[in-house]
């Protein structure tokens, strides 16, 4: 019998090499050409992926699974079951923001098929356990993943709920995918006579921490990978069964190049974490692979597979998942508003997207990996993962309370168990990891809304434990939450996104109050009702916008169009109306109904341009209403309070112009169902303006009972008003020209509601406390001091404000900024004197204390009194992820006349350019007795800082962009 060898000419010519047991060598008396794969025909195969039934299936569902795969939708088109753990889908993109879902419609290369994908997120992860079939005729490419990748065309690609198919044109392979909850099934139909060389990649996309692979004869394998990306430790286990035995397998090696100190190039072979399996041709030449997935272990993956896909029958398994999807669409039939056409397809596709997340996380035996990285068993419920709660608390979860009450109950139990495992309710949980992406504690409104709709925990103990979890989560351990409790707002000079955090914390506190009220805890209900009023502490009565509080006052300068780090993925326009639990009071502060309507009109009719930093999420603009991101989603429905006709006008406009069943049919990230949930709920002629509050739904036209009998209204409402809600005096506003001053400075104080009394205390340096007084008019300070103010209650129905403090520094008038560097308008750090004001930046550039330059910085400082210089220093900041690097070079010059300058210091600093994470560095020149230059009687000091690069290099994701330089204090002694 002739021994079989495999010859892969492209691999041998490229940097990719397969290890010896399969391609060991070719005997010299045999012709290598005999072992080359047959060339791929350019003609369509008779077994094209467009097989009968696929188009019919797609028309039956009226779903376009490719919606959102282009533009910035970040969706995936592959096969998944409703809420399935498995999302078996092609991977066409390895990195980049528009590659977060692993696939982008503008691509024409498939790297392989992986079993997990995120639906519409703004951060990349998943893409686990990649399989890629080839016929062995691979390409000559430097990297092995490029060598095995295949081109594809969209006219040879199809998809529908639970199914995906594509022609891999480089190999003539027709690939089909289907899935169950925990299992994915691949089918690869080869050209007649072709072998299948299948690749398995553990390294795909994420940083690989650990992996393993086990063999069970020649028809089954299992293994795992532990990876790091958005989730810092993600465990993915699998068990795969092949429909035929493989005749060879091996681990891959890849050539790597390095250059030594002498400039000599060295080429070495290194083992990589990828494997290949050879399958010989058969009569039908179809290879199927069933792959069970688990977050627990390989045994769990095996159980999942055999519980859900015991039959090696692709069409049977496909039919089963299609039946599951049919039940979904029967739960919420399209409203009469959309009987046919694009509206119907939009509605069905939106509903489909909503049912792809969250994902089942427990195995069929109930086991799951918890947030403590331990294995637990879900008793009496199903465990879930992927909770994008900052997005989904708005419309998605209120909608699912109606469509999936039992599943909502499971999600509530999941939240509670997560709290047990790590001490906090989830913020943005992913595969048992807390990513801390986004802000707020928005699992709270999900639970509060569920209770409003009659969905309960199964026992009183869990009900009370959830309240304990809410309280614990709202109070820490993060410092920003502690500051919020102390001041009634998150200070913008200490924490980033302070306005958004204050507003969302206040809303979440309202939901805690409502939940406590519903389960009968009056004390907690009243405490959090008071905290929920903190949104007023960032409302500026002059501009009528929500603004950052800095040093007791409002941050200046203020531009409502500017995108900066005081807001979460937004500007002041897009957070102006976020007080969903207090719309009548917000309306009153804006002047009443007429004025409120006028301000809404301004929102929708403002210029669409924004200023400040680039924010890819701000899309789908109608004026400054940004439908492409969640903070705006409730705003069109605010017209329900003043002019319902405009609700209809803007809702209909958004539905018709910002949604379409096309690859670029979403105006922003899908965001785990929220973008689609907005459409579904809007199609029902309703919207939850304030989830968690019985009065928080607006509805019109046809009753929701057309969709679900539970939707005729809430159950009998809980008795409201079990406590007398007191009003808190808003935090007083301390206003001054500058934080650092020369000579003297006037201080004025005001309060939003005109508090009857404002108590003032002043603490000078050295802990000297001056006599307190009640504020009556602006007053003067002449020394460095801290001012503390408190608004006092004017009646029994009011509560004193917290103590608010502001620190002011009297600096020497000897330093004057003569020529100011060209700092960016969004990173002013307070203005022209920021580099000499005595206020030092901390290890977070987003607090606004660092001054930012998008290029070279050059400034000149005048010393009023000529000085013998002993030291000059300049502080710099680096965090390479947001494109901020230390200056590559800093120079100091001195002059006696401001015309002739002598260089006294130059430092090149490039050694840290690839180090991630925030860090600071001080460029320091010390002039002692040994210094030979002249630094006496210096009148002017010039500082020059050069950016790290002209353009960001290829090794960074921001390749081609301009690096930032962030600087703070210049100290001259």
What is the meaning of each model-derived region?
Residues 35-397, 401-445, 451-503, 516-537, ...:
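Accessory carbohydrate-recognition regions in carbohydrate-active enzymes
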Residues 841-905, 909-911, 919-973:
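Aromatic, loop-rich ligand-recognition surfaces of beta-strand-rich domains
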